[in-house]
């Protein structure tokens, strides 16, 4: 398993190699990243995935505690992860679908504890959403402890994995609480396919708008394209072209130079289980896992890190492996750390298979039973040690025979005193080796033996002879008194002089000890152990097997003979009592041949307190609608005297989708369960209700579990602990230099309320539509001397998060522990969903009545819908009223009622179920009145005929007068004084644009328009020679009024007259039936404002920035917009709301004039309501429009200049820093926008021409195009209106006639024709200074092409019959 750390030089080296070969190894523009990416702590590290197509290794995303908005992060290039994907504790991440929309294959070449996909403790994750994930080649999945994760029961993992038996999916949000809805099921038009899982045949999807992809059965095990065409057999996951192994998303076997192949071609080698590389590539890969290695090797046509078992490199410079003769030699050792310390079986395991140890061998094994066999398995092959061998304090060793193949100690490095073999203080060592079958040589250096009471001196002398060291040792090197002699005595007492304690360390010093001959004082040994009671002795815990409960530390003599010796004991447990004593190690003899030494008395000392660990096994259950019972177990490590607990709780917002969906379909109502566990708590104030089975059976009891079930649960619990330990050990990297932050101190700074017996003062309105976005405060309470509490005064049937913190006696200084938490829901309150107060009714026209009723004040969670039962004789009719409809109208309308007496009752439905029916309300529907006698008809008929004739005469007169006035008019448009009026002439009549409803298919939501939701879909036969066309489908809300529906269709009717490449096309209308649909050309890149903002360079992008548009691209956008507006102008239409938000960007980046009004709800803040009028786009309006409500083509040109400013600033808000009222005054007083930073002069001069205060001084759209036509792309000539046959130059007689129509305005027009082509002085900044008309010093000519046209041609803006496009809905202009 690879390390979990993300940074490090090996990763950098891998990255350099992969980057250099990426273009030749993968057909896309992305890179191969590896050998693993670890993203932790900072969400901005996700930028490392920017260009990754394949991650050759693992991907970790974990430990990001600060909730962030991940919607701006999207990595569509990533398609394959060759090892595994791990997500752990990433706050704020709600779905993986936007993050990795095209992740298709997880190969599982190496696994994380047998899993290829691990999602663990992701508290905010709502769905997985990897809708393009098709294959997990090896390994299982583990999805655990994700409290808000849904859409797990709707995924058929058998379509992704070969076997699902090892999958582990537990501890997530219960499926009954999720209300998982696959696309189309709510509208009863399901879009997903069905499969059977656990005998349930159901739809399969990833999210509410993403189905799970299934290939046709004819493909078998082959992948398929998005259009369900079978891929080549060598493709895995998906492909772009059927039966083509060069367009696979991933390869089933191996990838080589853009082609998926079943085996690597000759001269290439398998690498990382998925691709083929050549020899040069393999030779240049650094071996990240072994500093001693010479790089990767080639064996059995595979490029790998090391030779397999039984093989060895044939030379140090070769990349190839050869079979070993006998055991394979293996050199071990570290150039930096030359001494290999063996203090446990784990450390010995690092020498498994080693035959030559380059360096020194230090054996220090103090405890362990039957450890010799383990050491022989791991160290038995060692033959040569190049340095020294030192064996000390190894009380578990009886013999050194586990080094059964050791034959040579070179002694190239020696201990002080020239020792190459050093044996000190091994209490149970009895034998070195069997010298009858051993040949060991110590080539250089001496031997030293001391304090081995069970090792005979004769054994030592035998080793002298065999190893050839006899004569090298002095008399003191092999002491006959302390080897082989168990007796020892200490005549002097050492006294401790000082002790200093921390939570995990102790410093002790003792007085200077001076034996008669100071040279015989070798060192000190400190013994210490945990001692809960002060009753330990020196010999506790020692036995013949070498077990010793005392820990020992060697202490060298202080360099200063006068200094006091001391030791720092570290790695201790907080708030733990330790017993400590010290021995002096000497060689001094007394007359009776006993060792003379010194020893201290046993000292008892306690470490300081520390922050406790978290409480364990937190459980919660509800015993009433306002109480939650919470129980937990004490922490494993109190690290002090446990004093109290802090209990904190927070109300959780409802799921957002509950506010959006219409739950009038009974089978779609989400189910919630309260915390119904059983906890033995003395404070329970309400007797829980016992479920009765009926009859004499008495209360229902759970069946006892069988022994097999208990054993299975036990094994599963053990396996779960092993996995969690493995997870934490793999991903948590120690950072000793980092200071720990106090959890409770941080938490307490954000608390909004605190009380020992807290009452939740909940004043939030449950019906607030924004409630699901509310962050509720935490409340807290202190619990003393017990591990349980009851939280009271809670809301009924509401979900709460409960955090428990442990606190010991030092909590005021150190803080409390981190929290362990649980989610629990209170019980529903009886009667909470009942509708209070009376139900009233109001008569309405056309045999209708309107019922009104109050909403439940404190319902069980959330009211989802209301049901009305009504009838004249019996209540046999039902009407469902959604939550959204009730909030909009405050009641419901019953239509098409027959005359007579009626009764009605109403019932509310919440998350917990149904409330009670209201008392019946009685109402009467009168019959329609009829003429009482025939005379009324005789009298009324002539009157009606006269009225009709009079009306026709008035209409003819008005029409004639309007036509005459239009001939004399100036082409201006005035805002209506009664914009809410509409006549019968506005009613929409179906025509040749009508499309059959069955030809339309909706796929996904694109956004909210002025009248309703806009969807992406497919239409059949709406475009000539195209069987199917991707389209945008505009809808009108179900609750829309008749006027709104007519406006919706009339707005579409306006678009019927347009046929221009740079104006979004109308493709059809579906007006028959409900809902009404308008079919538009699909603009895949959205509105221009959003597109421009997506091009903004982000801060700290690590050299991976999106490139803002160049000058040529800006000019191209401007020309395309101007061409669309010129077309509207030629057809005598005035737009009135030209802005970047109302321009759309096509797939090929062409900018077009949008379908007017689609973006009103999205950019509501761009509009301003002046007085009691409708919404006005004041920041884009010309001075004359703001003053007089006048809208002409000239005012559209002003707005066009603002659009140019938006393009140059990447859609900043115009007049930033000014309120709407200030903008109103500023523009009317002559103020202009600043020149944007880094704006080209050419573009800004064009803006200034559009912002002439005198409307007649502004250029026309045709003149604007003429000034920049040379900068446009060649394709512009082929598609534009400017170069089309429709754009014919006007006849001279027509120009003269139009000039004669406006004599009253000629005094404000300069007589010099060149004035029309000159720029104005630079406008003032936001200081309020006005921009004067006319040329000034330093003016520049914008384009000579202005002069090529007839002088004053751009002044001819007042044209006969000029019409205006309607502003978006709710505007009165």
From Swiss-Prot:
Its EC number is 2.7.10.1. ATP binds at residues 1006-1014, 1034. The keyword Methyltransferase does not apply. Disruption phenotype: Deficient mice are 45% of the size of wild-type littermates at birth, and die shortly due to severe organ hypoplasia. Residues 1-30 form the signal peptide. Residues 961-1373 are cytoplasmic. GO terms for biological process: adrenal gland development; animal organ morphogenesis; brain development; cellular response to glucose stimulus; cellular response to insulin stimulus; epidermis development; exocrine pancreas development; insulin-like growth factor receptor signaling pathway. Disulfide bonds join 33-52, 150-178, 182-205, 192-211, 215-224, 219-230, 231-239, 235-248, 251-260, 264-276, 282-303, 307-321, 324-328, 332-354, 456-489. The modification Phosphoserine is found at residues 1280, 1284. It catalyses: L-tyrosyl-[protein] + ATP = O-phospho-L-tyrosyl-[protein] + ADP + H(+). It is found in: Cell membrane. Residues 490-610, 611-709, 735-829, 835-928 form the Fibronectin type-III domain. There is a cross-link at residues 1170, 1173 (Glycyl lysine isopeptide (Lys-Gly) (interchain with G-Cter in ubiquitin)). Keywords: ATP-binding, Cell membrane, Cleavage on pair of basic residues, Disulfide bond, Glycoprotein, Isopeptide bond, Kinase, Membrane, Nucleotide-binding, Phosphoprotein, Receptor, Repeat, Signal, Transferase, Transmembrane, Transmembrane helix, Tyrosine-protein kinase, Ubl conjugation. Residues 1323-1332 have a biased composition (Basic and acidic residues). Tetramer of 2 alpha and 2 beta chains linked by disulfide bonds. The alpha chains contribute to the formation of the ligand-binding domain, while the beta chain carries the kinase domain. Interacts with PIK3R1 and with the PTB/PID domains of IRS1 and SHC1 in vitro when autophosphorylated on tyrosine residues. Forms a hybrid receptor with INSR, the hybrid is a tetramer consisting of 1 alpha chain and 1 beta chain of INSR and 1 alpha chain and 1 beta chain of IGF1R. Interacts with ARRB1 and ARRB2. Interacts with GRB10. Interacts with RACK1. Interacts with SOCS1, SOCS2 and SOCS3. Receptor tyrosine kinase which mediates actions of insulin-like growth factor 1 (IGF1). Binds IGF1 with high affinity and IGF2 and insulin (INS) with a lower affinity. The activated IGF1R is involved in cell growth and survival control. IGF1R is crucial for tumor transformation and survival of malignant cell. Ligand binding activates the receptor kinase, leading to receptor autophosphorylation, and tyrosines phosphorylation of multiple substrates, that function as signaling adapter proteins including, the insulin-receptor substrates (IRS1/2), Shc and 14-3-3 proteins. This is Insulin-like growth factor 1 receptor. It comes from Mus musculus (Mouse). The lineage of its organism: Eukaryota, Metazoa, Chordata, Craniata, Vertebrata.
């Amino acid at each position: 398993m690879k390390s979990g750390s993300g940074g490090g030089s090996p990763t950098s080296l891998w990255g350099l190699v992969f980057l250099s070969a990426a273009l030749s190894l993968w057909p896309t523009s992305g890179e191969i990243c590896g050998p693993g990416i670890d993203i932790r702590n900072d969400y901005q590290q996700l930028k490392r995935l920017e260009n990754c197509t394949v991650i050759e290794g693992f991907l970790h995303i974990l430990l990001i505690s600060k909730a962030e908005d991940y919607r701006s992060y999207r990595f569509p290039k990533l398609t394959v992860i060759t090892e595994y994907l791990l997500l752990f504790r990433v706050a704020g991440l709600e779905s993986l679908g936007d993050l990795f929309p095209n992740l298709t294959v997880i190969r599982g070449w190496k696994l994380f504890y047998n899993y290829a996909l691990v999602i663990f403790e992701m508290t905010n994750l709502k769905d997985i959403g990897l809708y393009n994930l098709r294959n997990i080649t090896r390994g299982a999945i583990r999805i655990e402890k994700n409290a808000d994760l849904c859409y797990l029961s709707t995924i058929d993992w058998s379509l992704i994995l070969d076997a699902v038996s090892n999958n582990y999916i537990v501890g997530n949000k219960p499926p009954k609480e999720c209300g998982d809805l696959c696309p189309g099921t709510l509208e009863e038009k399901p879009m997903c396919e069905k499969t059977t899982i656990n005998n349930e045949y159901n739809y399969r999807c990833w999210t509410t708008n993403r189905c799970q992809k299934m290939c046709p059965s004819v493909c078998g095990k082959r992948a398929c394209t998005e259009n369900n065409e079978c891929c080549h057999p060598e493709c895995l996951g998906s492909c772009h072209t059927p039966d083509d192994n060069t367009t696979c998303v991933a390869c089933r076997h191996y990838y080589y130079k853009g082609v998926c192949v079943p085996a690597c071609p000759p001269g290439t080698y398998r690498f990382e289980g998925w691709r083929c590389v050549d020899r040069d590539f393999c030779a240049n890969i650094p071996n990240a896992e072994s500093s001693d290695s010479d790089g990767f090797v080639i064996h059995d046509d595979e490029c790998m890190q090391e030779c397999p078992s039984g093989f060895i490199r044939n030379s140090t410079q070769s990349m190839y492996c050869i079979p070993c003769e006998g055991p394979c030699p293996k050199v071990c050792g570290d150039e930096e750390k030359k001494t290999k310390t063996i203090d446990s079986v784990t450390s010995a395991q690092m020498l498994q298979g080693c035959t030559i140890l380059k360096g020194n061998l230090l054996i220090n094994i103090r405890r362990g039973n039957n450890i010799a066999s383990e050491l022989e398995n791991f160290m038995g092959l060692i033959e040569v040690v190049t340095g020294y061998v030192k064996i000390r304090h190894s009380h578990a060793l009886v013999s050194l025979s586990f080094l059964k193949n050791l034959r040579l100690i070179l002694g190239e490095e020696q201990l002080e005193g020239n020792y190459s073999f050093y044996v000190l203080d091994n209490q149970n060592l009895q034998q070195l080796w069997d010298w009858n079958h051993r040949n060991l040589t110590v080539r250089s250096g001496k031997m030293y033996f001391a304090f081995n009471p069970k090792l005979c001196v004769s054994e030592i002398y035998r080793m002298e002879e065999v190893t050839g060291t006899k004569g090298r040792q002095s008399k003191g090197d092999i002491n006959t008194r302390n080897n082989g002699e168990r007796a020892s005595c200490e005549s002097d007492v050492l006294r401790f002089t000082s002790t200093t304690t921390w939570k995990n360390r102790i410093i002790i010093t003792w007085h200077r000890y001076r034996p008669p001959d100071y040279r015989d004082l070798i060192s000190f040994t400190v013994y210490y152990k945990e001692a809960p009671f002060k009753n330990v002795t020196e010999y506790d815990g020692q036995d013949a097997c070498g077990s010793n409960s005392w820990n020992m530390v060697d202490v060298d003599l202080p360099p200063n003979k006068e200094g006091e010796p001391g030791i720092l004991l570290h790695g201790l447990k907080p708030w733990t009592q330790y017993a400590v004593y010290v021995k002096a190690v000497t060689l001094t003899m007394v007359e009776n041949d006993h060792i003379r030494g010194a020893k201290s008395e046993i000292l008892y000392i306690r470490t300081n307190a520390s922050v406790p660990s978290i409480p364990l096994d937190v459980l919660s259950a509800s015993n009433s609608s306002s109480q939650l019972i919470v129980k937990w177990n004490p922490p494993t490590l109190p690290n002090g005297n446990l004093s109290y607990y802090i209990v904190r709780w927070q109300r959780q917002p409802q799921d957002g989708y509950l506010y959006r969906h219409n739950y009038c379909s009974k089978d779609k109502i989400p189910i919630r369960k309260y915390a119904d566990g059983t906890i033995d708590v003395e404070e329970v104030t309400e007797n829980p209700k016992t479920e009765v089975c009926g009859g004499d059976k008495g209360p229902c009891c759970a069946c006892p579990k069988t022994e097999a079930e208990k054993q299975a649960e036990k094994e599963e619990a053990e396996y779960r602990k092993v996995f969690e330990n493995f997870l934490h050990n793999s991903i948590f990297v120690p950072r000793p230099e980092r200071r720990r932050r106090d959890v409770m101190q941080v938490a307490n700074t954000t608390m909004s309320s605190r009380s020992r017996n807290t009452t939740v003062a909940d004043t939030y309105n449950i019906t607030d539509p924004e409630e699901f976005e509310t962050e509720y405060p935490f409340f807290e309470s202190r619990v003393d001397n017990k591990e349980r509490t009851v939280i009271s005064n809670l809301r009924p049937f509401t979900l709460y998060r409960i955090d428990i913190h442990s606190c010991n006696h030092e909590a005021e200084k150190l803080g409390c522990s981190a929290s362990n938490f649980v989610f629990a829901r209170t019980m529903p309150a009886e009667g909470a969903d009942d509708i209070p107060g009376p139900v009233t009714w109001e008569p309405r026209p056309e045999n209708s009545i309107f019922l009104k009723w109050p909403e439940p004040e404190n319902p069980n969670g959330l009211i989802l819908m209301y049901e009305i039962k009504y009838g004249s004789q019996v209540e046999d009719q039902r009407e469902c009223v959604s939550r959204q409809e009730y909030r909009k109208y405050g009641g419901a309308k019953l239509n098409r009622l027959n005359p007579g007496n009626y009764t009605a009752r109403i019932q509310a439905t919440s998350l917990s179920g149904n409330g009670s029916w209201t008392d019946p309300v009685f109402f009467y529907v009168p019959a329609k009145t009829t003429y009482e006698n025939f005379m009324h008809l005789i009298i009324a008929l002539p009157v009606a005929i006269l009225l009709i004739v009079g009306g026709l005469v008035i209409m003819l007169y008005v029409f004639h007068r309007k036509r005459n006035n239009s001939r004399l008019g100036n082409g201006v448009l005035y805002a209506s004084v009664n914009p809410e009026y509409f006549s019968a002439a506005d009613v929409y009549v179906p025509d040749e644009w009508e499309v059959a409803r069955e030809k339309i298919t909706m796929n996904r939501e694109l956004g909210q328009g002025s009248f309703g939701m806009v969807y992406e879909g497919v239409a059949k036969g709406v475009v000539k020679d195209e069987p199917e066309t991707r389209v945008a489908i505009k809808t009108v809300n179900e609750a829309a009024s008749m006027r709104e529906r007519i406006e919706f269709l009339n707005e579409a009717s306006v678009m019927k007259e347009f046929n221009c490449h740079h104006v979004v096309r109308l493709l059809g209308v579906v007006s028959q039936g409900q809902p009404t649909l308008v079919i538009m050309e699909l603009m895949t890149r959205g509105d221009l404002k959003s597109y421009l903002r997506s091009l903004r360079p982000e801060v700290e992008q690590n050299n991976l920035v999106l490139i803002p548009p160049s000058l040529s691209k800006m000019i191209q956008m401007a020309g395309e917009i101007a061409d669309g507006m010129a077309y509207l102008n030629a057809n005598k239409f005035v737009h009135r709301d030209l802005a970047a938000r109302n321009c759309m960007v096509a797939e090929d980046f062409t900018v077009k004039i949008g379908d007017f009004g689609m973006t009103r709800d999205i950019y509501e803040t761009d509009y301003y309501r002046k007085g009691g009028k409708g919404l006005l786009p004041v920041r884009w309006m010309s001075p004359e429009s703001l003053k007089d409500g006048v809208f002409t083509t000239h005012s559209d040109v002003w707005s066009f200049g603002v659009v140019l400013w938006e393009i140059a600033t990447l859609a900043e808000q115009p007049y930033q820093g000014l309120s709407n009222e200030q903008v109103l005054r500023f523009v009317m007083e002559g103020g202009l926008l600043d020149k944007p930073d880094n704006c080209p002069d050419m573009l800004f001069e064009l803006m200034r021409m559009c912002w002439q205060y005198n409307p007649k001084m502004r250029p026309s759209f045709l003149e604007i195009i003429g000034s920049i036509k040379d900068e446009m792309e060649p394709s512009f000539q082929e598609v534009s209106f400017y170069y089309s046959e429709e754009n014919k130059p006007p006849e001279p007689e027509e120009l003269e006639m139009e000039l004669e129509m406006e004599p009253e305005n000629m005094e404000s027009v300069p007589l010099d024709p060149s004035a029309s082509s000159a720029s104005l002085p630079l406008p003032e900044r936001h200081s309020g200074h006005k921009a004067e008309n006319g040329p000034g010093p330093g003016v520049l000519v914008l384009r000579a092409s202005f002069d090529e046209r007839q002088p004053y041609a751009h002044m001819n803006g007042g044209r006969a019959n000029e019409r205006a496009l309607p502003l978006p809905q709710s505007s009165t202009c």
